[in-house]
Amino acid sequence: MNAPIDERDFLTDSYDYALPERCIAQQPAEPRDHSRLLVVDGEAHTHRYFYDLPGLLRPGDLLVLNDTRVIPARLFGSKASGGRVEVLLLEPRAPREWLCLVKPARRLAVGARIDFDGVLAARVTELDAETGGRWLRFEGEEDFEAALERVGHTPLPPYLKTGRTRDERYQTLWASRPGAVAAPTAGLHFSGELLARLAERGIERATVTLHVGLGTFRPVQSVSVHTHRMHREWYEIPEATAIAIERTRSRGGRVLAVGTTSARALESAAQPNGLPATGPGRSELFVYPGYRWRVVEGLITNFHLPRSSLLMLVSSLVGRERLLALYREAVDKGYRFYSFGDAMLILPGAGA
């Protein structure tokens, strides 16, 4: 599963590539499963469509999905002075206390109060040196999630320039556990019909939860990957998923993660026996070439930003130079990149 490495694999500059703006998808494919699919199988690769997935997998394979749900985490409020403030919820430490990115952060000191359209209010309780953000305690009697639904907005990535996307298209069909500030985008390609066809072929499904957080928005700024620090993200591995993985292995099936977030959750919980420990945890796992995969054998993933930790994770499976060559070919063939773009299927053995 692991690709050969060289010293350039540890330099952030080695993960740069040119991407024409026309390749950045502004709308999702319709229907969901009509996106294109670049299949990497051993030393070969082919160009297919996502609806071909059942025929590309084997009966007895297991797909592990991230069931997190994107919350309306982008808020617009006012300070007592009348100045406007934009808030992005990142991570809770209590139901009504969240680490947030705020703009403008200047002059938003501890004790400052922000009002959100008379529905919610929050007070700054602490500054966060690591992120430059603020800890906010939200006030009010209304249920917090209900209030968020009233005043919050889906935090679409900054490279999406259109406002025409329906919020439900930025959720997977199985999204059930609120807490993410970005979607696990590999799951956006699955339609109800495709899920039914996968089940008919004997391909099983299991879930994990990883609430996608700040790390999605942070490029790797350091010169070397060795000095980059990932932002922590909350995850949970259900007992049923660990059992499904063990059963899949015992029957000769393969474990494929749907998305880098599912992969990071499983690998963060990995034990020496190749099974994930069950229960909740917090992941700061940074995967790049040289990483030894213990649970995940294959991956479904989108096309990622230059110099991103996600690009480095995928490079650990297929090799950096090969991955960048595949990306160049995808650009030439008109593939669509990023959150609403096309996908890759990396089958076990691609990095051999």
Curated annotation (Swiss-Prot):
Intracellular or extracellular location(s) = Cytoplasm
Which keywords does UniProt give here?
Cytoplasm, Queuosine biosynthesis, S-adenosyl-L-methionine, Transferase
One biological process term from GO is:
queuosine biosynthetic process
- UniProt keyword S-adenosyl-L-methionine present: yes
Q: Name one Pfam family in it.
A: Queuosine_synth
Q: Which reaction does it catalyse?
A: 7-aminomethyl-7-carbaguanosine(34) in tRNA + S-adenosyl-L-methionine = epoxyqueuosine(34) in tRNA + adenine + L-methionine + 2 H(+)
Which Gene3D superfamilies does the annotation name?
QueA-like
User: From the UniProt record, which GO molecular function terms apply?
Assistant: S-adenosylmethionine:tRNA ribosyltransferase-isomerase activity
Q: In which pathway does it act?
A: tRNA modification; tRNA-queuosine biosynthesis
Question: In its keyword annotation, does this UniProt entry include Cytoplasm?
Answer: yes
What EC number(s) does the entry state? 2.4.99.17
Q: Which InterPro entries match?
A: QueA (IPR003699), QueA_dom1 (IPR042118), QueA_dom2 (IPR042119), QueA_sf (IPR036100)
Q: Which domain of life is it from?
A: Bacteria
- The UniProt transmembrane annotation reads none
A single GO CC term for this protein reads: cytoplasm
UniProt xrefs under HAMAP family: QueA
Query: Subunit comment for this entry?
Result: Monomer.
* Its job: Transfers and isomerizes the ribose moiety from AdoMet to the 7-aminomethyl group of 7-deazaguanine (preQ1-tRNA) to give epoxyqueuosine (oQ-tRNA).
Task: Give the UniProt family note.
Answer: Belongs to the QueA family.
The protein depicted here goes by the name: S-adenosylmethionine:tRNA ribosyltransferase-isomerase
Source organism: Gloeobacter violaceus (strain ATCC 29082 / PCC 7421)
Q: Name the gene.
A: queA
